[in-house]
Every structure is written in structure tokens, then in C-alpha cells.
């Protein structure tokens, strides 16, 4: 008999590529009050690629950019949007406005209004197709 593999194990075995073509990443938040890693540019609302805005901006690590087949130059000039697919349903559509440190695959959601305890620790991200309203 064959053993059944759940979705999370399948994503892990495929190198982090989900069945929807997205990439599994760690989901973190930045820019909230008392953020222990807040820097002066974030405090001013400045991202590496564009100004930061609530309900719009995210920061990606270089490894997440590479997994999505993006370069820093592409992000600077094209201002791509991503879809963050949350476990259990729901999608956040956000623009890449900043860089996140560290080497792991991670999306850092800009939350100046406060830390959002309802967001999960992991999500699947993909490039957004189509226009953004």
C-alpha cells in the first residue's frame, strides 16, 4: 500500500513549491509599534523600493524574490504585486516595497497599525496576475 502524504509534506518535499505554483514562506510582520527590529527608514515610511503604506506594502527576502523569479531591478522598475495565500483560506494582495533581511524565504507584512495576531506563521506566495483595484 502507498502512504498518503498531506499537502504540507508535499510542499516541503517539492522544495517549497506549492501546487498552485506559489512558494511556501515564513510570514512575519514589521513596522508595528514596539517592533524590536524597527529601523529609522521604516519609522519614516521608507522602503528599499518605494514608500511604505498600510494594507499595501510587504518586504521580501532575497531568497523569496529569487523563488518568484524576480530581481531587485525588476522590483524597482515594475513594482510587482504578490498574493499571500493564507492557510485556511483568504488572500492578501500586496506590493513589494521593501527588502527583508535574512536568507530564509520570508514575507514581512507592513503593519503600522499594530501587530496582527490573526495572521499565520506560514503562507504561500505567488505573483499577482491582473490589475490591482
Short names for language-model regions:
Residues 1-17:
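N-terminal secretory leader/proregion of peptide precursors and effectors
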Residues 17-133:
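Secreted/periplasmic proteins
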Amino acid at each position: 500500500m502507498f502512504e498518503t502524504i498531506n499537502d504540507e509534506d508535499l510542499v516541503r518535499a517539492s522544495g517549497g513549491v506549492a501546487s498552485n505554483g506559489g512558494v511556501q514562506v515564513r510570514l512575519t510582520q514589521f513596522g508595528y509599534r514596539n517592533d524590536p527590529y524597527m529601523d529609522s527608514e521604516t519609522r519614516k515610511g521608507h522602503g528599499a523600493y518605494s514608500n511604505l503604506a498600510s494594507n499595501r506594502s510587504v518586504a521580501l527576502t532575497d531568497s523569496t524574490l529569487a523563488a518568484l523569479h524576480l530581481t531587485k531591478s525588476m522590483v524597482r522598475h515594475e513594482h510587482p504585486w504578490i498574493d499571500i495565500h493564507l492557510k485556511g483560506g483568504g488572500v492578501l494582495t500586496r506590493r513589494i516595497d521593501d527588502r527583508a533581511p535574512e536568507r530564509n524565504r520570508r514575507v514581512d507584512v507592513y503593519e503600522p497599525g499594530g501587530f496582527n495576531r490573526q495572521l499565520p506563521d506560514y503562507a504561500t506566495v505567488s505573483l499577482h496576475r491582473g490589475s490591482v483595484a
